Amino acid sequence: MIIHKTADVNGMFKREYAFTLTKLGTAKEQMEKLDEALQCYTMAMQITKELLAASPDDGKLKWNMFASYEQIGHIAELKHNYREAELLYRQSLEICRTNVKLGTRPFDEDALASSLYRLGALPLQRKATDERKNALKKRCP
């Protein structure tokens, strides 16, 4: 792919590419094309990991990594893969919790609360899905 062969001295091109992939993933998610959204989010996360390895103190990159785990976790949740969603949400929570303690911008208590909420809501989602499945089983012998 030509995109990866272009010189990118300060990582700005890769940052913009990851941002674009994230926006595309969001659009695909809104169109209910979850597999395509997942592919975009995963590619954006990989680029962010590479950039973060080169700049481990970059708060914006840390935020992007946090957001990537949240987005991929949300896709897993929408696909009823609750165990996978839980693992991804726990990873995002750990990134957020660590960076709130360190005072890394843009992490704050609101982001932490949101992350905790997503993780805490999963058992309710799982229960509702199980109840729907059981109701369908009773209707269709």
Task: Name each model-derived stretch.
Residues 12, 16-19, 60-67, 107, ...:
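Residue register of alpha-helical TPR repeats
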Residues 10, 30, 58, 78, ...:
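Alpha-helical rod/repeat scaffolding segments in eukaryotic adaptors/tethers
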Residues 1-16, 23-40, 46, 79, ...:
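Leucine-rich, hydrophobic repeat-scaffold detector
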Residues 2-6, 47-54, 95-103, 122, ...:
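Residue position in alpha-helical solenoids
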